[in-house]
Design a protein with these regions (language model features):
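General helical secondary-structure elements
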Residues: 7, 25-29, 54
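Catalytic cores of phosphodiester-bond hydrolases, prominently lipid phosphodiesterases
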Residues: 19, 35-38, 46-412
Length: 412
């Protein structure tokens, strides 16, 4: 009897264990199915978002593309056929907050002058019909893709010629590489996805505009062009992320289009082996030797380290490398990018003795403040970028300058 009860109890325990194990297995399978379904739904939703994003981005690009091409073509024709008829060269003294001729005679150097610069210098307004697609981009990306676009929807610059006429002597090109049938070309725009409206879509056309103005103003102060190669692309029309072959092709375009106006790293270095050696000697070239010239600087974002590796001597390169402060010991670096003027002010003792060319941003559209402007004027930077430069377009908006001038001496 006892044995029977024991066996019955043992069987019950065994059955209970089997039942619990079976339920656990069943529950595990249910959880697995829920996880699998959740992942499927997530990836389907992600695919829908990405597809919607790509469709909207492509639509914005193509809406702006035709207008960009037509604008640049008509602008170059206007300059050639109308603007320069009876043209009077710009008086460089009129844009300088100092006696220019005296400074030239005294040998004032490139790094002893501050130039007012524009940021994303080819910026135009997106076509109105693109806004619905931009809002779609904003929606499907939860506001991430559009960035600050809607804050900047009224932000635009004069043409490059207009900026040069207003005394701007430093401009910026954000550049995308495009490959078609093996041929590499370059497009200038702030952002291929949401901000592709530009007055200078084709790089060669942009350089042609600069060279044409330079030819009509042969004794102008040096023009500094900051080039930022984009590290991401929209998979459309053969756009590619910058690589070694793209940068080599870019240098070739600069040499072809700028010709003897290009003031190369080799021109700047003279007999020095590196920019570090040249800076220690505080021997940047005098302005007088740079009149009528164009200096091209490669922005630290993207490709600088690989660009330097192509030729560490910089003798065959077309652009002067820029770096961030933390990379200041790079021997080939001539420029430092300090986007925040307060950082440059905090490091002012370093910049006073290191003899770098420094680029900072005085404002960021639509935001500006007198405090930041004061820091920009104090920080010893030679390239001071503003989104509120003197201009013809939108004259009702705020304007920043050096008390009415666009070039000033730096007091070290």
């Amino acid at each position: 009897m006892f044995l029977f009860k024991f066996k019955s109890k043992g069987r019950c325990i065994s059955e209970k264990l089997w039942y619990n194990k079976s339920m656990a297995t069943h529950k595990g399978k249910r959880i697995g199915k829920i996880i699998a379904v959740t992942l499927i739904v997530f990836f389907l939703a992600l695919a829908i978002v990405i597809t919607g994003y790509m469709m909207a981005a492509r639509k914005v690009y193509f809406i702006n593309k035709v207008d960009n091409e037509n604008f640049q073509k008509s602008n170059l024709e206007y300059l050639k056929n109308t603007f320069y008829n009876g043209y009077t060269p710009k008086d460089e003294q009129s844009i300088c907050a100092f006696d220019l001729q005296k400074a030239l005679d005294e040998g004032v150097r490139y790094n002893q002058v501050a130039f007012l610069a524009t940021h994303n210098s080819c910026q135009r307004l997106n076509r109105p019909e693109s806004e619905e697609y931009l809002r779609a981009l904003d929606y499907v990306s939860f506001g991430l893709a559009s960035g600050d676009f809607f804050d900047k929807k009224n932000f635009e610059y004069d043409t490059l010629t207009g900026q040069l006429e207003h005394g701007i002597r430093s401009i910026e090109f954000d550049v995308e590489a495009k490959v078609s049938k093996g041929d590499i070309s370059f497009k200038v725009m702030h952002d291929l996805v949401v901000d592709s409206a530009t007055s200078c879509l084709d790089l060669e056309g942009a350089l042609e505009e600069v060279v044409t103005w330079s030819n009509h103003n042969p004794n102008h102060l040096p023009i500094t062009i900051l080039v930022e190669s984009k590290a991401y692309v929209l998979p459309v029309e053969g756009f590619q992320v910058f690589g070694s072959r793209h940068v080599k092709a870019f240098d070739e375009v600069l040499r072809k289009c700028l010709g003897d106006k290009l003031f190369t790293p080799s021109d700047m270095l003279g007999d020095y082996a590196t920019f570090e050696e040249m800076r220690k000697a505080n021997d940047w070239k005098p302005l007088k030797e740079m009149l009528g010239k164009v200096v091209v600087v490669l922005h630290e974002a993207g490709f600088v380290k690989k660009y330097i590796k192509q030729d560490p001597t910089m003798r065959t390169q077309a652009m002067i490398p820029s770096v961030l402060y933390e990379d200041r010991n790079t021997p080939q670096a001539g420029f430092i990018i300090e986007n925040k003027p307060q950082d440059a002010v905090e490091r002012i003792d370093f910049y006073r003795t290191a003899n770098f060319m420094v680029r900072t941003r005085a404002d960021k559209y639509p935001h500006f403040s007198e405090e930041r402007y004061a820091l920009a004027n104090q920080c010893l930077s030679q390239i001071i970028t503003t989104d509120y430069a003197p201009r013809d377009l939108r004259p009702e908006q705020h304007t920043f300058s050096f008390d009415g001038f666009t070039v000033k001496l730096i007091s070290f």
